[in-house]
């Protein structure tokens, strides 16, 4: 199935039903009083994370999703039925953004997480609500409010422990093939990897971590060169980044310059991502021999001012790969995933009708009663009098 990690959809919550103005009119019950019911609330729109999905492709074809409208109130104090909610299933790791305001509504990072993205309109109030000691026959009501409508940008961000960085042909896909059962395409030309892929690396019988491979970056990616930087978002939730460097590029490019290019593009995309723990790994040491590779790696590290440790591996032959995966596993276990409070602002996400409950009673709609007789007679026919709102 084609990997789609972005989709723009229209979500429309249901409108609230209008309140009803009616009076109880029964024989032998003079002036029975108001009995207009409230309308029903409009339906809401939710997103729910489903671990069985891995792409947003369904939302590329169907763009509009609307919840049900609340029913109008009726006589005899009958409240209108609430509009039907709709729930849209998305892959785990999906972020919802209001495309107009760019407000991040929330992230769905666990299976079964549910999030409100469009709130239904508040129900209108029937005339029963306006009865008081000084207004025994109220002719006021309120109409239901319109449901929220949003242009919603869905972004799928892969959930992985380890993210792979590097130029095209650095050997990222070969590394994933060597440490996991994933089989990304491998070839001797740039941009073999066109979409992100995940692999599960097992260390021993009971330990494992998830590694994400993204298409390689090139100089100018921040301005759209190559495949651009759109896939870097998939590394935002990784705990550690592996910067894989071809120690002796076949195109005779300078590894020092190659490292600088990646760091620059990463920084231009996100300072937060650039500050993540990053390990330097020199690949393809089998092409020049271990001793020459060690000397070359030392010179490169000195030129870029690298202060930490670095690794020399051959993803193709598996040389030193096992030690690297063990060290990665130890790091991950020593640094458990933190529940980043990126969604702290979610508590402050203000939906359109949050204050309507308090304001509705202050602005009622009054019916035009010029055509109706205020005098109630006990001789009237038995039944309920319903006053319908004029078009």
Swiss-Prot record:
One of its GO terms (cellular component) is cytoplasm. One of its GO terms (molecular function) is GTPase activity. It comes from the Bacteria. Pfam families: GTP1_OBG, MMR_HSR1. Its cofactor is Mg(2+). Its main location: cytoplasm. GO terms for biological process: ribosome biogenesis. InterPro entries: G_OBG, GTP-bd, GTP-bd_Obg/CgtA, GTP1-OBG_CS, GTP1_OBG_dom, GTP1_OBG_dom_sf, OBG_GTPase, P-loop_NTPase. The keyword GTP-binding applies. Keywords: Cytoplasm, GTP-binding, Hydrolase, Magnesium, Metal-binding, Nucleotide-binding. Residues 1-159 form the Obg domain. Residues 160-333 form the OBG-type G domain. It is an enzyme of class 3 (hydrolase). HAMAP family: GTPase_Obg (MF_01454). NCBIfam families: Obg_CgtA (TIGR02729), PRK12297.1 (NF008955), PRK12299.1 (NF008956). Belongs to the TRAFAC class OBG-HflX-like GTPase superfamily. OBG GTPase family. Monomer. This is GTPase Obg. It comes from Haemophilus ducreyi (strain 35000HP / ATCC 700724).
